[in-house]
UniProtKB/Swiss-Prot annotation:
Associates with core 1 beta-3-galactosyltransferase (C1GALT1), probably not with the soluble active form. GO terms for biological process: platelet activation; platelet morphogenesis; protein O-linked glycosylation. It is a single-pass type II membrane protein. This is C1GALT1-specific chaperone 1. Belongs to the glycosyltransferase 31 family. Beta3-Gal-T subfamily. It is found in: Membrane. Residues 27-316 are lumenal. GO terms for cellular component: membrane. Keywords: Chaperone, Membrane, Signal-anchor, Transmembrane, Transmembrane helix. It comes from Mus musculus. Probable chaperone required for the generation of 1 O-glycan Gal-beta1-3GalNAc-alpha1-Ser/Thr (T antigen), which is a precursor for many extended O-glycans in glycoproteins. Probably acts as a specific molecular chaperone assisting the folding/stability of core 1 beta-3-galactosyltransferase (C1GALT1). InterPro entries: C1GALT1/C1GALT1_chp1 (IPR026050).
Amino acid sequence: MLSESSSFLKGVMLGSIFCALITMLGHIRIGNRMHHHEHHHLQAPNKDDISKISEAERMELSKSFRVYCIVLVKPKDVSLWAAVKETWTKHCDKAEFFSSENVKVFESINMDTNDMWLMMRKAYKYAYDQYRDQYNWFFLARPTTFAVIENLKYFLLKKDQSQPFYLGHTVKSGDLEYVSVDGGIVLSIESMKRLNSLLSVPEKCPEQGGMIWKISEDKQLAVCLKYAGVFAENAEDADGKDVFNTKSVGLFIKEAMTNQPNQVVEGCCSDMAVTFNGLTPNQMHVMMYGVYRLRAFGHVFNDALVFLPPNGSEND
């Protein structure tokens, strides 16, 4: 039999959960009704799609397809910050770091807040105000994330940036479907436009979460985008495997060795993966070597379309 004190604590916990749910529903409600939307499973183009593109179109795509990268950092992330700066962000058409405070070691844009949601919304507003006429797609990541930007561009190849895309690794929390920031978040310029129009409307996109329960920044973003008619969509390859990953390659391989010991490499993850998360600085450099430097003699990949790294990139 539970003691009176434990019964009291149980009641407090249940009451808190109830209040949290009410707060969450209040955020997601649009007008006087709820919008019901099952997220789509968007796939990368196949080789046949690419083969149908003319040589002139391929050249134009390789030059005009532009991705702006946003990395949210804090001073405690300085070693990860250095690794990200020296590795995959060099393949973004432009990458900028948004920090919680001024950091002398690396150049960054000071958001002057430790709150991750405030940092995220300020970074999105800055990116839209500064670069809305220069970039088609906006990719946001943590400093623990490694991204293969060429694979991101390939995945987005047949997607229309004038449509409201909100892509990545989707997660469902109650009635809310959102893209996990751990795997990286991709917004089209149209989604950025819609989000920007709501950032100054606190009733639909508040700077803070509920008074009782604060939700994570990626969930808060989904709430704001839902008001704008933009919904989370899961990104997959032609085999249905996720291309935005919230875990590291090492963890995927460990799981595959347990669950699919005869198909560790094939069962691990997509060979067109865009992101992995939870990496150390050392693992960032290992990934960079494996993705861009290591070659198996005799194995040649004749890709029909090549996305060239931006001018000034030291990586090939």
